[in-house]
A protein has these predicted regions:
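C-terminal interaction-tip segments
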Residues: 1-29, 33, 54, 84, ...
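Compositionally biased, intrinsically disordered low-complexity regions enriched in proline and serine
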Residues: 6, 22, 47, 63-66, ...
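Short solvent-exposed strand-capping/beta-turn motif centered on an Asx-Ser/Thr pair
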Residues: 36-41, 94
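Short beta-strand segments
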Residues: 44, 61-65, 98
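The feature marks short-to-medium sequence segments in extracytoplasmic or secretory-pathway proteins
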Residues: 44-55
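Intrinsically disordered, low-complexity Pro/Gly/Ser/Thr-rich segments with frequent PxxP/GP/PP motifs
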Residues: 53-88
């Protein structure tokens, strides 16, 4: 099995929940870090979900819910989230002023 350490995804938020990352077929992923950067001079909020196997969104899938990101700040989460093929990470922000990055490894 090969392990690729990489930037998994980088995306600006929108006011709608959007898919940020989907684990490729025949692959497992470990998200080691999530970084949220607020590029606005105002506070913003965000949500992050992890949905296994194309599951319909439920309360249990949120790993962050309406978290406030202070103006012009960056928050880094060091994690060890394990994902299976087709699992997805979704994001939502109060505006487009938030940038979210996922870092980790894909094992295939």
């Amino acid at each position: 099995m090969a392990t690729a350490y990489k930037v998994l995804a980088q995306q600006a938020t929108t006011a709608s929940l959007v898919s940020m990352y989907t684990v490729p077929a025949s692959t497992e992923t470990i998200i080691s870090s999530i970084v949220v950067a607020n590029t606005s001079a105002s506070d913003r909020t965000y949500r992050i979900t992890v949905q296994p196997n194309n599951a319909t969104l439920a309360q249990k899938h949120y790993i962050a819910y309406d978290v406030t990101s202070k103006a012009n700040t960056t928050t880094a989460y060091t994690l060890g989230i394990t994902l299976d093929a087709t699992d997805q990470v979704y994001i939502l922000g109060s505006t487009t002023d938030l940038s979210i990055s996922l870092f980790g490894s894909e094992i295939s």
